């Protein structure tokens, strides 16, 4: 049956900001859906509040709304655009929940919109625990013994039946938010209280514990004629008890017998039929008891998921694209497989002749005080995928692609340590982010495979693989470099050992191993991901490396090529914004006739889609892997400035190896990053900087600090996302920093800067081609200096800065660009205090604000800069004037503190946000209000506000209090703040701080008395004292600000209506022309 003709226009719901549990895999699926449906001639309307996505580019849909994914806003869009259908399966849990809400509120019925891809009933049947259990029993499949509770009493009754340990999961939350494992009644009550609060339906599912069972997933696609295919089976390396998003996973499943696989395959198809998914992809999760083979269905997601992005990249089968076409009425046999160039239909089940491993990436070091043990609640922020011909090869490639300082199974503990075994046992039993390395340490320390199995419940087959690698490592260490003959080295390379790891084991430099391989002429070959195990020829160049005989890379020799290095796995500080830039570089250079080559290892992103570039190498972004690809492809230029710190770190070494790095030279990048060299440039240009010093010892720091004056910003040199960066207020604080946060030495200097308190911070993005400088945008931060720029909301155009100040910055940016010989993108950060402009830092690379500026101004900066790097001037491109839009755009960030109870949610110089949203309005207030709604803020228009501010904010707080009163708020204040307000004739109710007696602030927050809290602090002691206010505000969902500027922005936003007017990106950009 060909496509439906009764629908002409389709609304696609996006996933919104990136949060833990819902990352850029939904940009990948949404972008594919837009392409697939427009190919078929439908008018596509898209809503997504996240500006850092490819899917919100104006070319991707006919009407694109960067608006909050909130049912009232979406209703306005439906009313204006009148779509015939809505597709909710491409935007994760956010889109499903929004679609169900639109259905519940009667919006779909009111405007005659049909839901395609999944029916409201199928979504509800899969997501509602009780209905799901009944459905599974009906088809003869078991689910875990469980019960449902809506109150604490009901929960305790269920626990009595299920027993401890038990697993608690709230309904309709994502990434296991609010769930956990309870081993006793006390833990049980704590987890249930949190879960009831987080579940939108106030519903908990309490399950018997399946801890230690094996976990599997099936990616299934079904069409309306009941054609069903399994795209991929996935096995979790980690046993049940760890969220699948935090588990190492392997595809295809490795430890199932064929009979077990067939049973699971049939069961997963039966699940889709029973739930009623008949147009698209779903993921079904199973648990198997290794003791007796009992099979249980855990859950199913009736939508495209994180696993389906992985399955798509692992097999080359584009699940999201196929699902979008099935949603409009096609069947699988009518669709052709792109990768084989249409030689096979989409109803062919993919078969693969390689092994894929995914390892999650964690960021616990950003959250002091967080519980870093892995549970049923997802905590990872990104993932890496690797492809190899064996389990060992793909696992070792994934370890080095993860970029956590490991080149393979580097040891975590020294075996001389008397506590070594105790530590290893603890890490194996109670898994943290590094367990995989501790497993190797366990074998080094003499544990047997059975010993490790008893502690981890990881299948012995996987453990034997790791044990063998450890034994090989011991042999390399024993024979040294002289013992590495051609056969032995080939055997090691086939098992995935990195040159760098072998060098460490043999006690030589990495370059010597590379030289040895050159002598033996030992290089990897490249195989293709082709969905059909090489049965048919493929036109698509999607490659992975391995050490075998036949190379399938087949590089062209007649075209000029440019290679883009991607950013590797997502992490805080280096996320989707950098992937966005890489994709734009590839698209722009393709349009200009270059052959583009992408190198990356992140399965969630658009950059690793096989049709984003001409050739895709799915490889770790390390020196060894990149040099081997350069050797075979011989590109004219390589772009390292777009993928964040990952490729930048390789710039010098690549250049030294003769690789043509284009754009700003590695030397110029170093001049901006190296403190002393940068200082010389600044002095030559006579620009102002805050007083600063570079120190290499503690006593030296104490001396310099006296000259500069406190407070200080301290940080190690060369970091992204503000790692180990703090504000210190006095000498004792400075000494504490050196003892706990960093080790300082001649090789690792620490930078001290005078901290400009209360300054306004400004970000400027620009492009330089050597002849002229184009200002992309000037963004004024809402939080004052001292909050990491990646965690601060910002406005474009600036909302308080004078024209003169902005012109001073424009001139300074231009001078810096020429001085540093920038070719391509650059980002400059300034601070403005008492009408003076201070230069904070310069980054001659793509910054995380590039996508936001591009959406706000309509100038695709990353594309323009990529063309500049390839030698096309700004004048030739006709892009020479700065665009200042006639409307305001505000970027707001999304923070993951709800996943890390116990962490202080105070914003500071260390970046901790995972994602961003954008709001657009005619006034700053309207734009800010929309950004707040988009970031799921709990802002209320009135009620009771609590004010507790530091000494330096007391003058300005009076004005803020007056604004809140005018808005209809009642006011409470702590002692010091109340005195200042009283003197100004405002009489708030006085409240006790926690140590002043009860009822105190925390009691009042718990009782739900406040709708808004503003709490600003300075000094270590005050920060510690007031931490309980911020934690409680977060826990009880009270909107709070930790800076006075944030408070003023909030007060302005209270007057605006965020749901009143919607505007598409296309309409915005038309106003600029």
UniProtKB/Swiss-Prot annotation:
It comes from the Bacteria. InterPro entries: ATP-grasp (IPR011761), CarbamoylP_synth_lsu (IPR006275), CarbamoylP_synth_lsu_oligo (IPR005480), CarbamoylP_synth_lsu_oligo_sf (IPR036897), CbamoylP_synth_lsu-like_ATP-bd (IPR005479), CbamoylP_synth_lsu_CPSase_dom (IPR005483), MGS-like_dom (IPR011607), MGS-like_dom_sf (IPR036914). The keyword DNA repair does not apply. Residues 937-1073 form the MGS-like domain. ATP 1 binds at residues 129, 169, 175-176, 208, 210, 215, 241-243, 285, 299. ATP 2 binds at residues 715, 754, 756, 761, 786-789, 829, 841. GO terms for biological process: 'de novo' UMP biosynthetic process; amino acid biosynthetic process; glutamine metabolic process; L-arginine biosynthetic process; pyrimidine nucleobase biosynthetic process. Residues 133-328, 679-870 form the ATP-grasp domain. PROSITE patterns: ATP_GRASP, CPSASE_1, CPSASE_2, MGS. Mn(2+) 1 binds at residues 285, 299. Pathway: Amino-acid biosynthesis; L-arginine biosynthesis; carbamoyl phosphate from bicarbonate: step 1/1; Pyrimidine metabolism; UMP biosynthesis via de novo pathway; (S)-dihydroorotate from bicarbonate: step 1/3. Mg(2+) 4 binds at residues 841, 843. Residues 2-403 are annotated as: Carboxyphosphate synthetic domain. It catalyses: hydrogencarbonate + L-glutamine + 2 ATP + H2O = carbamoyl phosphate + L-glutamate + 2 ADP + phosphate + 2 H(+). GO terms for cellular component: carbamoyl-phosphate synthase complex; cytoplasm; cytosol. One of its GO terms (molecular function) is carbamoyl-phosphate synthase (glutamine-hydrolyzing) activity. Mn(2+) 2 binds at residues 299, 301. Coiled coil: none annotated. Its cofactor is Mg(2+); Mn(2+). HAMAP family: CPSase_L_chain_A, CPSase_L_chain_B. This is Carbamoyl phosphate synthase large chain. It comes from Escherichia coli (strain K12). The gene is carB.
